[in-house]
């Protein structure tokens, strides 16, 4: 009975650690149409473990992603790869004259983490000509 109980406990513990390992993917797909793991880049970041020691690839399907994105300092070792730069666009429209936010807060995408790369996509600030604006703000 003691051996059976130990076996059941070991099986349950092993099963829960396997579930935790399966929770963190090394490839994530973002697609506006819902065909991927996430619909937005912001949602995808929630699916990436903090301070990873392995590389994660985020495949971004073509589409226009209108969102203000912050990649926090705990997000490291991530490659964002778009389908192509002409049709995979991350955009927002803040500018310096909105609520006196100043130029440095107008970014579309802010990178605070290290070892973050972007390939085959466009990052733009689509603000009207009402004030200065930043597309990419990098601190990492």
Predicted regions and their residues:
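Bacterial Sec-dependent N-terminal signal peptides
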Residues: 1-23
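Acidic Gly/Asp/Thr-rich repetitive segments characteristic of extracellular carbohydrate-active
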Residues: 25-59
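Structural detector of coil-to-beta-strand junctions
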Residues: 27, 68, 108, 133-137
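Right-handed parallel beta-helix/beta-spiral solenoid domain characteristic of secreted/periplasmic
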Residues: 32-34, 57, 76-132
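Short, T/G/N/S-enriched strand-turn elements that build extracellular solenoid repeat scaffolds
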Residues: 39-50, 66-74, 80
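Short His-Asn-centered micro-motif
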Residues: 61-62, 119, 139
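Short active-site-proximal "capping" loops at secondary-structure junctions
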Residues: 63-67, 85-87
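Low-complexity, polar/charged sequence tracts that form flexible coils or short amphipathic helices
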Residues: 71-72, 128-130, 137-140
């Amino acid at each position: 009975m003691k051996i059976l109980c130990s076996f059941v406990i070991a099986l349950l513990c092993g099963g829960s650690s396997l579930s935790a390992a399966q929770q963190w993917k090394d490839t994530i797909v973002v697609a506006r149409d819902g065909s991927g793991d996430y619909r937005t880049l912001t949602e995808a970041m929630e699916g990436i473990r903090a301070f990873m020691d392995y590389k994660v690839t985020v495949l971004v399907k073509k589409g226009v992603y209108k969102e203000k994105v912050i990649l926090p300092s705990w997000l490291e070792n991530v490659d964002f790869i778009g389908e192509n730069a002409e049709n995979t666009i991350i955009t927002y429209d803040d500018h310096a004259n909105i609520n006196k936010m100043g130029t440095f807060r107008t970014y579309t995408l802010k990178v605070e983490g290290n070892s973050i790369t972007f390939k085959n996509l466009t990052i733009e600030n689509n603000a009207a000509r009402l004030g200065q604006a930043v597309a990419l703000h990098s601190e990492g």
